[in-house]
Amino acid sequence: MTTTRVCIDSSVALKIVRHCQESAPSIVAGQLLGLDVDGELRISHAFAFPQNAAGGNPNSDDGLSLRLKAVAKYQPEMIDHLKEVNVDSNSVGWYQSTVLGRIYNASVIENLAVFQEKNPDSVVLVYDVAGSEVVSDTDPSSTGPQGHTTTTPSGFNLRAFRLSEEYLNVRKSGKFDTATLTENNLTYHDVLVELPVEIKNSNLATLLLYQLGQQYPNSPFAESSFSNLNVSVDPFLEKNIEAIFDSVDDFHYDQGNYNYYQRQMTREQAKITQWQQKRKAENAAREKDGRPALPTDEWKRLFKLPTEPSRQDNLLISAQLNEHCSVIEEFGAAVNSKLFATQGGLL
């Protein structure tokens, strides 16, 4: 992996946002095309996948299946057509919409692993429909001399992710047990690596925005933001709290399965210890009688230890729970300020 940041052409970003917004609440996806230039992944084009590539249910944890026959047939055909018009045809990942940051599911992880096997620099661009509110800002400082704007969680929620080296190493071993996770230092914090996202305008678009800013300067009324006076609790925050409850339920269910495995393991190990002590006593008696000792490893044939369940689900659920908590921590500060201001009669 050589790229450390993602740069998206503004027209591509608008195309992604429009596709995701118009298809909401259905979950949709599309192909990303671009190049790796000096450690920067430049995304210059994108096109949508067929609608049936999506699960359709925004509340489902199943995510998208990008290996359907319709997608497998449509993707190469579309790339061939783009080659004919000299568009970058190098696949650098895919984009998809989501609701409430639900990206930590087996489908997203598996799709990303397949993409990174073909191109280690591949990423997934995630646009959160529920957490995005695209705001227009004509302040010249927001575009800058290079025409750059950045994404913020409180507004334009477009984020780039890639699987970490630790996760790929564990996946390569084929074992998601506790020993393998510990050996590779993999925790729920390290499943995905988030890359900084930068949106770049072309020089002509930057010039146009500058001219419009000079021609229609902001008035004091246009700069006012009366939304700050709204004291109602953000519905987005409420939905995240509900999502936390769902994630906690999933976590308890998965933890219950693991606790059952541990009880079974403890029970079997107690039986093995008892058998070994008995065999040790038998060998001591046989030694006194001058008879050969019995083998001490027969317990491997007599007892079968339970197999540890995969810890992948636990990793993903924990990571998703942490994602919801981070959102609440970020948005909760603003909501608490409004509530305290209301209580103090300041609004």
Curated annotation (Swiss-Prot):
GO biological process, one term: formation of cytoplasmic translation initiation complex
GO CC terms of this entry: eukaryotic 43S preinitiation complex; eukaryotic 48S preinitiation complex; eukaryotic translation initiation factor 3 complex
Family matches, as Gene3D superfamilies: Cytidine Deaminase, domain 2 (3.40.140.10)
Pfam families reported in the protein's UniProt record: eIF3h_C, JAB
Domain MPN stretches: 6-149
Alphabetized InterPro entries for the sequence: eIF3h, eIF3h_C, JAMM/MPN+_dom, JAMM_MPN+_peptidase_M67A, MPN
Key word NADP present: no
Oligomer status and interactors: Component of the eukaryotic translation initiation factor 3 (eIF-3) complex.
The family this protein is said to belong to: Belongs to the eIF-3 subunit H family.
Role, per record: Component of the eukaryotic translation initiation factor 3 (eIF-3) complex, which is involved in protein synthesis of a specialized repertoire of mRNAs and, together with other initiation factors, stimulates binding of mRNA and methionyl-tRNAi to the 40S ribosome. The eIF-3 complex specifically targets and initiates translation of a subset of mRNAs involved in cell proliferation.
The name this protein goes by in its record: Eukaryotic translation initiation factor 3 subunit H
Upper classification of the organism: Eukaryota, Fungi, Dikarya, Ascomycota, Saccharomycotina
